[in-house]
Amino acid sequence: MMTDPLSRSHAAALDAADPLRALRDAFVFPQHGGQDQTYFVGNSLGLQPRQARAMVSEVLDQWGALAVEGHFTGPTQWLTYHQLVRDGLARVVGAQPDEVVAMNTLTVNLHLMMASFYRPSAERAAILIEAGAFPSDRHAVESQLRLHGLDPDTHLIEVEPDAADGTLSMDAIAATIAQHGPRLALVLWPGIQYRTGQAFALGEIARLARAQGAAVGFDLAHAVGNIPLSLHDDGVDFAVWCHYKYLNAGPGAVGGCFVHARHAHSNLPRMAGWWGHEQPTRFRMEPQFVPSPGAEGWQLSNPPVLALAPLRASLELFDQAGMPALRAKSEQLTGHLEQLIHTRVPQVLQIVTPADPAQRGCQLSLRVAGGRTQGRALFEYLQSVGVLGDWREPDVIRIAPVPLYNRFCDLHQLVEHVETWAAA
């Protein structure tokens, strides 16, 4: 007799056969009623890798034993500590090692990148973003325009959603880039839209922007560690991201930055700091700034070693699993959840995120029948029973099954609780 592919027993069989199942044990889960919480919020804050504590302790022990000499001696000297995460990050984002650096935080890095790559002229001064962009991106863009004496009402162009669910078609993006091409100095685009969960064809967007003579940058906050990326091959000028979501580096973690290799030895103007000076002569303390080649030349201050340690722990797990395997499981998990919703609670939940797996990561953005009031009620009920998603105003519950630690059975637990709530 065939097993129902949407049954609990089939989900348990999928979990038992999952080649990545052991990775779940590498994370610390919050507890609810003495059991692991069912956690779907890796798109907001990833779980703590168990090895993170040991790697942070290693830094603390080295600090205690060596003090300032820890910069130059010890098992992991701090002078080059940031380079311990470089190769792993390059693999995750599809870059060469010298194109990436872990530094600062996302919006700080965005400002640094715009200082170099947003170079407005009288004819070409506009910045293009998506309507409904994450507020920090919009604040950064508007402030950069004002720093150049430009009016955001005139020089900030937004691509409006052209679908009823709030998503954006590639046709709309391409048409807007073509319409405003001669005016565009910069196209700044997300890898995944934070509210809808829509993923974009980044290579195509980069090609369209560069064909119009605009610089192109990506905010990969919701894409890095979630979907396959190929920043070098896509030809993007720069990208920025955070590490506290899918990269599991902890609250307020150090950010990440990509600068394409074609800019490695350029004389681009930049906001400079001493840690961006070339390493061989940095400690001569000479007044002339000589940038390190590649992305490291945009560093300002010495790296936050304690904050980098959890990122090391997480990247080891990414290397252990590999992005292709993680993506394959992610598509299975999110597709399974989509089927469960359509089959068992279609009258309760509407999926906002595109159905095409190529246009989404692991996140499904959900609206609840009855609007915001009912949505909040369901969200709070799920919290009360130990199932954690997150809420985004005005009316979206985001659920992100993360392949590193979520199971197929978790999806059934979620949907069963939705059924219980709806029947009450």
UniProtKB/Swiss-Prot annotation:
Q: In this record, what's one Pfam family?
A: KYNU_C
Which keywords annotate this record? Hydrolase, Pyridine nucleotide biosynthesis, Pyridoxal phosphate
Q: Which GO terms describe its molecular function?
A: kynureninase activity; pyridoxal phosphate binding
**Enzyme Commission code(s) on record:** 3.7.1.3
Q: Which residues carry this modification: N6-(pyridoxal phosphate)lysine?
A: K245
Name the enzyme's class.
Answer: hydrolase
Q: What is this protein called?
A: Kynureninase
Whose protein is this, by species?
Xanthomonas campestris pv. campestris (strain ATCC 33913 / DSM 3586 / NCPPB 528 / LMG 568 / P 25)
Instruction: Name the gene for this chain.
Output: kynU
